[in-house]
């Protein structure tokens, strides 16, 4: 079985401490955004991700939490990382009509097996057909 075949939508995600970079086969880099998420504390909804959320760091009302969920190469906030990743992948899939893509995710080297599984589940919940 080929990991990245010629007849499917394949996405690569670099889940970095500073930025998340997303590529689509044949299109190159389609997203390079800060690894930041803003979450409504009352209901857990995503308010913003990436550059928009970065602008909110230290400037949000009490009911909104803007954070960098990855710190020093590890996942510092497990839930926020899941929400951020899911939101960004859903946006890319919609914007580029990626349907249910196969996704390869590069994760920080220091994450635990539980965190790795959570990243995989987040990508699947975002609509991926397969995650590697």
Predicted regions located by residue number:
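Nucleotide/phosphate-binding catalytic cleft detector across ATP-hydrolyzing
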Residues: 1-132
């Amino acid at each position: 079985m080929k990991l990245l075949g010629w007849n499917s939508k394949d996405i690569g995600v670099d889940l970095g401490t500073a930025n998340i970079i997303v590529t689509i086969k044949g299109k190159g880099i389609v997203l390079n955004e800060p690894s930041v998420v803003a979450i409504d504390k009352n209901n857990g909804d995503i308010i913003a991700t990436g550059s928009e959320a970065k602008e909110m760091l230290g400037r949000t009302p009490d009911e909104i939490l803007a954070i960098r969920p990855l710190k020093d190469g590890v996942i510092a906030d497990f839930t926020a990382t899941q929400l951020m990743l899911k939101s960004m992948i859903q946006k890319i899939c919609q914007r580029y009509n990626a349907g249910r893509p196969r996704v390869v995710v590069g994760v920080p080297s220091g994450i635990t097996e539980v965190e790795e599984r959570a990243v995989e589940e987040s990508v699947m919940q975002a609509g991926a057909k397969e995650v590697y």
